[in-house]
């Protein structure tokens, strides 16, 4: 059985736009949750979120694409490129190793903001005024697709869309791809950018979001008896996974090894996990 290790890290978060900045802010006890500034939240029940700050998509994407793509794609590409740089991997044109390097970048919702803005354009100005980039700039698989173009990744390229588990499933599926010999390197993780009017409104009317607007720094408390919902965040977290012998042969820095991966569903409620936790038990057996 081929072994799978982690050799690269990439991160865009409410605490910083790279791994080092985010990690140092976390160690300093910083909190990235605050009042939402991306749009006017005055009439919303939930008015707080974990926004990515001071992020310029044009630093990571070609200028035209930075304007045309939803921001979740830019988050994913930024974190993916940081992870590849951290791993010391670069695949030039004509490099046969590129055919053994793939990508799985996932999201739970994808380009909701871009879709909704174009829907508004459709209603107000008609179908001919909708952006021709509405579809390619918002569909979830374009995050990995754009990264593969930017970094010449010609191996397996797919997307998992499983709500909050999307990024974890991306990493797990990527590890399986390497184990079975279909790739030597996989860039895998999740990206999301759904702090937008429709995203907040949709979760808020489900009573899924915290309304602790007067205390955003302490609003996210999932295991507290006083919890009142989750806090929407945005950003991307990406790993470079690599076959162990491949990593060792090139002298790569190895962070850890992925020992296993399991998945299941408890066939219960549409949003609420089963309280006795069978879905968490089965994959670990």
Protein language model annotation of sequence segments:
Residues 41-51, 110-114, 193-220, 238, ...:
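Active-site-adjacent elements of ketosynthase-type condensing enzymes
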Residues 167:
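Short conserved active-site loop signatures built around small residues
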Residues 10, 104-107, 161, 186-192, ...:
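Short beta-strand segments
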Residues 9-16:
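Short polar catalytic/cofactor-binding loops
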Residues 76-87, 143, 170, 242-243, ...:
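Short, well-ordered amphipathic alpha-helical segments that serve as non-catalytic structural scaffolds
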Residues 6, 23, 27-162, 191-202:
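Conserved beta-ketoacyl condensing-enzyme motif
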Residues 1, 86-104, 117-132, 149-157, ...:
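Structural signature of cysteine-dependent C-C bond-forming condensing enzymes
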Residues 3-7, 34, 214-285:
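Condensing-enzyme catalytic core mediating Claisen C-C bond formation in acyl metabolism
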